[in-house]
Amino acid sequence: TNKDPDNFIRTTMLINTLNFAFTDFDTSIKYSIERDGQKLSDSEAMFTQVNEAIDSGIDLLNGEVLEKLTIEELEKIFEGNIKMPMLKERVEILNLVGAKLVDSYEGDWLNFIKNGPRKLYANGEGLIERLVLEFPRFDDSSIYLDKEVNFYKLAQLAFWGIHGELAHSDYFRIEDME
């Protein structure tokens, strides 16, 4: 949908915010949609529907929209073979992410990214360090044997995706990625 690098970054951050739990826990049925005779499931279905919503004029890349998004609006975006699993949690996460973007970054993921060094780790100021601190959705750490273990998979995937797509153009390159 977005050839524009700024919107690619915004979309990637949005997708990574929503990228979890696509199977109904009770029935084990995967969330899926059909487009052009093809069945799309899991994150592929979600990605397609996010882009369709954006193309239809729903500005999911804007923190102000995310902050006020309702479960009814998200249900309309994610119409599939079953109700999107964990829809209530997704709305809560999007509302929190939107509120943080509005409060601290004028509603825009780009301002979050521009607010620090282009490094994943930089004495607490790196992209991953700030993302997991400021956006709890991305903080996938646990306690194991009385020690904190940090995975940061979602945060890493977000920035790997952006870096992989845009590093060749020098538009967005993370200094400590390789």
Please annotate each region the language model reported.
Residues 1-178:
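HhH-family (HhH-GPD) DNA N-glycosylase catalytic core used in base-excision repair
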